[in-house]
Structure formats: C-alpha cells, structure tokens
Amino acid sequence: MVTIQADEISNIIRERIEQYNREVKIVNTGTVLQVGDGIARIHGLDEVMAGELVEFEEGTIGIALNLESNNVGVVLMGDGLMIQEGSSVKATGRIAQIPVSEGYLGRVINALAKPIDGRGEISASESRLIESPAPGIISRRSVYEPLQTGLIAIDSMIPIGRGQRELIIGDRQTGKTAVATDTILNQKGQNVICVYVAIGQKASSVAQVVTTFQERGAMEYTIVVAETADSPATLQYLAPYTGAALAEYFMYRERHTSIIYDDPSKQAQAYRQMSLLLRRPPGREAYPGDVFYLHSRLLERAAKSSSRLGEGSMTALPIVETQSGDVSAYIPTNVISITDGQIFLSADLFNAGIRPAINVGISVSRVGSAAQIKAMKQVAGKSKLELAQFAELEAFAQFASDLDKATQNQLARGQRLRELLKQSQSAPLTVEEQIVTIYTGTNGYLDSLEIGQVKKFLVQLRTYLKTNKPQFQEIISSTKTFTEEAEALLKEAIQEQMERFLLQEQT
C-alpha cells in the first residue's frame, strides 16, 4: 500500500503556488461566417486594425481589409480549403511584414518572402513592413547619376537615372520584359542590387528569365519575387510590395537598387478581383476607387536618398501591357501620370525587325540629360532630333516621286541611324561602346556603307578599338568626357577599320 507523505504533497503545492503567474492574456477572436473565392467574412474581431494579419484555426493567414459594422472582410493568403464555417479566427496584432537580409540575393521567393527555388531556408535577423511609407521630400535629392541599361536607344535618348521611375509600356510580345532583363544583365559589376517581381506571369516565362540570369551570372546580385498566374489574388497583390520592401532594405543601407515590376496591371486585376468579392463599389473599368493609390504608394517608394541618408537609390521600372496600342486605358494612364517618363514599345516596329522596338518619338524621360555622363551628352545630344526629322521626312518621301540630293542624303543617314539602334537580346553594350556607335553614325562615317553592312562594321569597329586603342576606353571611364584626344583616337580607329572592312568586303 502506498503511503501518502503529507510534507511532499505540501511542498509540491507550494512550488505550484510560487510558479503561478497571474498574467491575463486577451485574445481578439472571431467566428467565420462565410468563406469562399479567397475571401472570408468574420463575426467578432472587434478591435482588429485595417491591414492586420489574422490567423485561422487550421493555420491559414489572412489580411483584414474591410472593417464593417457587423463583420470583417478578410482576404486569404492561401486557398483556404480547410477553413470551415463557424471555426474560430484570432487577430495577431501584427501588420504584414517580411524578413530581410543579404541572404536573399540570388534567390527566388514568393510574396511572403519564402524561398521557392528548393535551396533551403534563408536566414534573416531583421524584418521590414511590406507597406512602409515612401521617403519624404527632405529625405530625397534630385536624380543625377545614370542607370545604364546597355541599350543604345535608351541610354542615348531616353536616359534613366538612379532613383527614377521609368515606365516600359507596349502591347504583348513587343519585348518589354527583354528590355528589363537586359537592364539587369547590364548591372553586372556596377554595384547595383536588382529585384525582379513577376506578378501573374506564366511559370514557364519566369523560369526562362531566371535561367537567363543564372547563365549570365546575374543572379548573384538579383532577387526574383514570383507569384505566377495560378497564385491566389492576395499574393499577386502583395508581391510588388514585398519586392519594394527588399529593395528599400538595401537602399537604406546606402546601396543602389533597381526594381522591375512585371507587371502592375496584373496586380490591379488581382486587386479588382479582391475588391469586387469584398463588395466594394466598382468604378471605371470595374476597378475600385483606390486603384490609383494602389500604384502610387508603390512607385513613390522609389527614390534617390539625400546625402544625410547615405545617397542610396531605388530605381523602379514598371512594365504595363496595353491592348492594341491603347495608352489611354485606365491603368496605363494612371501609371504614366505617376512615373517620370515612359519607354513606348511598338508592335509595328517589332514586326518590321527593329528590335528593341522602342518608339523614340513618343518615349520620354523627364529626368533627361541629368542622368547621362558628359561624354554621352556631347555625342548623343542631337540624335533624338535627327531621328524625329528623319521619321517625318520618311513619311513625306512616300508621297514624293523625285527627291533632291540633300533629302536623299538625309534619308540615307536616318536609315543608318535607325540601323545602329538595333540590338540583339541579352547583348547590352557598355557606355564606351555606345559612344563609339553613336559618334560613327551621327558623323556620317556609315553613309558610304550599305545598310546591311552597318551592324557588321560596328561590331568589328568596337572589337578593333578595344584591342588596338585601349586608351580610348580609359579616357572615357576616367574623365566621363569625350575629350579631343578621345575623338582623335576614335577617328583614327574608324578610318583604319573602314579601310580593312572595305578590303575584306571586296575579297
């Protein structure tokens, strides 16, 4: 028979009394009234904040978006198939935030900053709010440093500066993503961190972009945030803000970053879906009234930090798809009004074999030559005007039967200028190579060649200059100016290469 020892029992009771903690924990809970289509309506959750994360019984997380008098509208970050009517929900007291660290470089993640590339977890000690306020006026300075894209047409005539927001707009299949990916490839060795956000894209397209980055060694300074077409609308809506939070982390650490949103119109469609299901009143094209704010609060986060904050920068390149060239639709006009200029890609030019299919006439950068090095300004200053005059003359020449010699010469020069702007995909050029190309065209050195020979000659000239006149590149990179010495070296190289080229063509 077991003997009961009173002193042992009393000791245990005393210990328990001493360990007893009278802490009262208040949990804000609610009950699921209705769930479906990625939306849940919750009764209760009286003190929930707008945008607060809520947790369902079976582990799904949601965001409280609609705070109504008798229920709360929650959008789900998952399929929500296991959520049942009547199950409990608790408020977490947190606004959506993600972990941030250097460890994200070279990784492919989703909108919740979870890796989806099968390479294990990412360690991070800090976190940032997904939606943080944009820098104020005092925290910024004007854009003055160039962000080189490696594309002659952009860097010479529609320059992009670090901290600028430049829209890339055009119909489907006109090479918009190619312009953005070439820009990322060109940042190699430039100390710029790149973030590529794929919103509602095909998984195969995203995989292709990631493969290109890996093959070209661009993943070491790039983060890919991907929410493909089969992702829930909530995650497609959040993905751009996640990308912006990661880019901001580096910007506030005095680094230069570039972020590509591909594309915000898909984010707007996801937001429209969520809003309509939450029974928010529809506006133009059935978008909710705050769809402008959706994009403005995202793009305003791009900035050039003031010297007090370390002069970091975040350059935003949103990509918007138009329907048969209609830039007056709701989302394109909204994004055009928010950004500092746009690069317009034309389906007609693309089909005519002019690639990148940039319509230089209606593309514009509101930062302008402030985002160019002096050498580029010296060489490319007049090229946009010359091309515009050529386009006008070409349209007129279609109706004229006989043209005088001067007009014929101007047309021939224009055709060669247009030819030198053509570039293969994933073949960005350095600033020095671009200066060589533009100078050769604008100063008439290509006029004696056939149009079909222009590209071949320029490739050979750039190679010849690199091997035989390395001083040219040194002068441009050190002084950032097209000096008389540099011009003399270039003229010499053009003449020498032209003689070699013509002999080569004759044989």
From Swiss-Prot:
A Pfam short name: ATP-synt_ab_C
Official protein name in the record: ATP synthase subunit alpha, chloroplastic
GO MF term (any one): proton-transporting ATP synthase activity, rotational mechanism
Family listed: Belongs to the ATPase alpha/beta chains family.
InterPro entries according to UniProt: ATP_synth_asu-like_sf, ATP_synth_asu_C, ATP_synth_asu_C_sf, ATP_synth_F1_a_nt-bd_dom, ATP_synth_F1_asu, ATPase_a/bsu_AS, ATPase_F1/V1/A1_a/bsu_N, ATPase_F1/V1/A1_a/bsu_N_sf
Main location: plastid
First-tier enzyme category under EC: translocase
Binding site for ATP: 170-177
Stored SUPFAM superfamilies: C-terminal domain of alpha and beta subunits of F1 ATP synthase, N-terminal domain of alpha and beta subunits of F1 ATP synthase, P-loop containing nucleoside triphosphate hydrolases
The UniProt record lists the keyword Translocase: yes
E.C. number: 7.1.2.2
Keywords for this protein: ATP synthesis, ATP-binding, CF(1), Chloroplast, Hydrogen ion transport, Ion transport, Membrane, Nucleotide-binding, Plastid, Thylakoid, Translocase, Transport
Required for activity, annotated site positions: 363
Keyword Transmembrane: no
Subunit: F-type ATPases have 2 components, CF(1) - the catalytic core - and CF(0) - the membrane proton channel. CF(1) has five subunits: alpha(3), beta(3), gamma(1), delta(1), epsilon(1). CF(0) has four main subunits: a, b, b' and c.
Function in brief: Produces ATP from ADP in the presence of a proton gradient across the membrane. The alpha chain is a regulatory subunit.
Source domain of life: Eukaryota
